[in-house]
Amino acid sequence: MFNGKQIKAKNQYFNKEISRLKSCLSNNQKSSKQIKNLYNKRNNQLTDIFHKLSKRIVNLLVENKIGNLVVGYNKGWKDSINLGKRNNQTFVSISYEKLINYLKYKCEMIGINLIINEESYTSKCDSLALEEIKKHDAYLGKRIKRGLFQSSIGKLIYADVNGSLNILRKVVNDSEIISKIINSGWLFRPIRVNIL
């Protein structure tokens, strides 16, 4: 599990600075050289981080002889959303699509199959109970606090891991393979890796 705190912190810092500078502009002014420079600096730093992250992911796939990478993505995911001042500063301008494009070309170069799949209802459905991934009136498991999912089988799992397994389940319809992954135990002890 890659730690996204560095990306979020950088993005929030730049967005806060840009917002501060915009508040100092006169009414008829839309931008300034300083704001444009900050946008460029943020974009360059995020591009660098995404290149490094995509390279690390692809290297892990090669080291572990994995030929397929499944990625969840919803088109228009962050378009016209308002998550509140703090979350907008942190998340909205992080280009997940850019990361996917870097993964795509790096995977193609070495023959790894990249599968991009939509991820609706993957965070709400209980992956450990193999709950059908669709809209339900009541879901088997539930998120009990930020980042932690309580499965209906009585186990706790990181919410991101639950969602990731469900994204994989949407692509791999083989319940035997999914059961092997669940029974391997690594889902309950993910290793957090810093990007940089």
Regions of interest found by a model, annotated:
Residues 1-196:
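Positively charged, helix-rich recognition surfaces that bind polyanionic ligands
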